[in-house]
């Protein structure tokens, strides 16, 4: 027997759309464009809505009779509606028991429908407050997370400072400092390695070549005609100066 196939509770992904949005199609610009935004009207749950409609439309605009006044307490009205729904449901049960075919059954169903519509309308009027409260809670959570992150960074910084101070305190007091002469030689060597960009006189060039020949004694010099002529010229210039 084969292994039992796992069945997902979710519907399968829409393969007709997944095949269109591959990485290659997106890279080549062949992926379908998103649909244009709706600007006039649209259908939702079988009802037509306008884009400029209010988020929560008044009951009168939907052709529904208002049972509560314009100025009211939401909490109190919701409790009244809940109690009215319970009473009308019990009346409907009594009608179904005594006279199921009576016209009062349809009237009671319409009353229950109207009560439920009003209850949902009052609940929907709380949606903006719920959205603001959700946003406030989300921002508080983000603020608390950022403060905790900053506190952890501060603790790590203090630990690093303590480690550096411990390393400094563990160093011996008689630690030899770098010699100034060696530092000077290193500086002169670094300076000599740089190229001079300003123009030089002929005497400076000749003197520099003579100094190089005199100081670089360890460097082997080729005994060819060119090097001998340079040495002779340097000696003549030295005697003239």
Curated annotation (Swiss-Prot):
Protein's organism: Danio rerio
Compartmental location: Nucleus
Origin: domain of life: Eukaryota
One GO term describing the cellular component: mediator complex
Subcellular location, principal: nucleus
Subunit-level organization: Component of the Mediator complex.
Region entry Disordered, spans: 175-197
Family statement drawn from the similarity comment of this UniProt entry: Belongs to the Mediator complex subunit 7 family.
Matches recorded under InterPro entries: Immune_Mod/Transcr_Coactivator, Med7/Med21-like, Mediatior_Med7, Mediatior_Med7_sf
Record keywords: Activator, Nucleus, Transcription, Transcription regulation
Low complexity: bias regions: 175-193
Protein name as it appears in the record: Mediator of RNA polymerase II transcription subunit 7
GO biological process: regulation of transcription by RNA polymerase II
Task of the protein: Component of the Mediator complex, a coactivator involved in the regulated transcription of nearly all RNA polymerase II-dependent genes. Mediator functions as a bridge to convey information from gene-specific regulatory proteins to the basal RNA polymerase II transcription machinery. Mediator is recruited to promoters by direct interactions with regulatory proteins and serves as a scaffold for the assembly of a functional preinitiation complex with RNA polymerase II and the general transcription factors.
Nucleotide-binding is among the record's keywords: no
Keyword Nucleus: yes
Gene Ontology molecular function terms on file: transcription coregulator activity
Gene3D superfamilies in alphabetical order: 6.10.140.200
């Amino acid at each position: 027997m084969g292994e039992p196939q796992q069945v997902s509770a979710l519907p399968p992904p829409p393969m007709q759309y997944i095949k269109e949005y591959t990485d290659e199609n997106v890279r080549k610009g062949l992926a379908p464009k998103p649909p244009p935004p709706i600007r006039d009207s649209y259908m939702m749950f079988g009802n037509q809505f306008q884009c400029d409609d209010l988020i929560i439309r008044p009951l009168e605009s939907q052709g529904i009779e208002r049972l509560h006044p314009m100025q009211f307490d939401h909490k109190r009205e919701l409790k009244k509606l809940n109690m009215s729904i319970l009473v009308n449901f019990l009346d409907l049960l009594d009608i179904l028991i005594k006279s199921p075919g009576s016209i009062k059954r349809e009237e009671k169903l319409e009353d229950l429908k109207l009560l439920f519509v009003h209850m949902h309308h009052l609940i929907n009027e709380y949606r903006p407050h719920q959205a603001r409260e959700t946003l406030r809670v989300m921002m508080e959570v983000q603020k608390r997370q950022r403060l905790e992150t900053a506190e952890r960074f501060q603790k790590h910084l203090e630990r690093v400072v303590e480690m550096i101070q411990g390393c400094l305190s563990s160093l011996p007091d008689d630690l030899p400092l770098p010699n100034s002469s060696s530092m000077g030689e290193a500086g002169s060597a670094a300076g000599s390695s740089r190229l001079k960009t300003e123009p030089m006189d002929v005497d400076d060039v000749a003197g520099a070549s003579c100094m190089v020949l005199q100081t670089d004694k360890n460097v082997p010099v080729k005994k060819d005609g060119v090097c001998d002529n340079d040495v002779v010229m340097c000696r003549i210039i030295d005697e003239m100066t």
